[in-house]
Amino acid sequence: MANSFSWKTKFKSIIIVDGELFANEYSIKLFITPYTANLKEQTEYFDRLKNLFEMVFANTITTWRDDPLYHILQKSSSNRFIELPKPPYDQIMAAVCFCKANAILDSNITVNKLELSSWQGDGITYSVDKDSKELILLDTPNWFSKKYESFDPWWLRADTATYDRELDKGIYTGHFSWNNKIPVDKKHETHAKIFEFNPKVLDGGKNKNK
C-alpha cells in the first residue's frame, strides 16, 4: 500500500468582491499519496505541485468570471488571474485547487483531500475530497463557445492556465510551462495554442508533447 503524507503551503491573491479589491492569503493543507514507484518521478511531480501553489497561483487576482471589474482589469492591467465559475468564496476556491492539483499530477500522485482557509474567511477551514458536494458547484455548461466546447475548464486540465480565454490559435494554456525544455517567452498570450505554448518554465516538467 502506498505511503501517504501531508503538506502545508500558503499563497497570496487579491480577491474581487462586489466590485472591490481585497488582499487575501490562502492557507492550504494537502493529504497526498504517491502512486509511482519511481523516486525521480515522485520528486518531479511534487515539485510541480509546489510550483502550482507557490508560483502559478501566487500573486494573482481571484475573481468570478462574470464580475464587471474583472473584465476592466483584463483590458487595463497585466495581472494574472484565477477565474472562478462562481464568486470567490473559500468553498469554491478549495474545490478549484483540489481539481487543478490532481489534474497536473497525471495520477502519479493523488491529492486525497485538501483543506483551505483564508485571511478573509473568518477562521473557517473548508475540506474537499473526491466525494465533496462542493465539486458540483464547478459544473459549468457552456464555459467555452461551441468551437471549443470539447475542452475542459482550466481547473480540470494539466496545463498551467488559471483562467480561460479563446484565442485565434486555440485556447490559452497558461503563463508557465511544465516542460523544462521550452524557453521563456514573455509574449505568452500571442503564442498560445491548444496544449502547445512557449511560456515561463517551472520545475516538475516531463518531456511530453501536450
Give a label for each model feature.
Residues 139-210:
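Intrinsic low-complexity, glycine/proline- and repeat-rich
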Residues 104-118:
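Short, surface-exposed ligand- or partner-binding patches at beta-edge/loop junctions that are enriched
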Residues 2-3, 7-8, 12:
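Fungi-biased regulatory scaffold/adaptor regions
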Residues 7-9, 129-131, 166:
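Charged, low-complexity, helix-prone segments enriched in Lys/Glu/Asp/Gln
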Residues 10-99, 178-210:
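Histidine-centered catalytic/metal-coordination loop motif
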Residues 116-156:
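Short, low-complexity, polybasic intrinsically disordered segments
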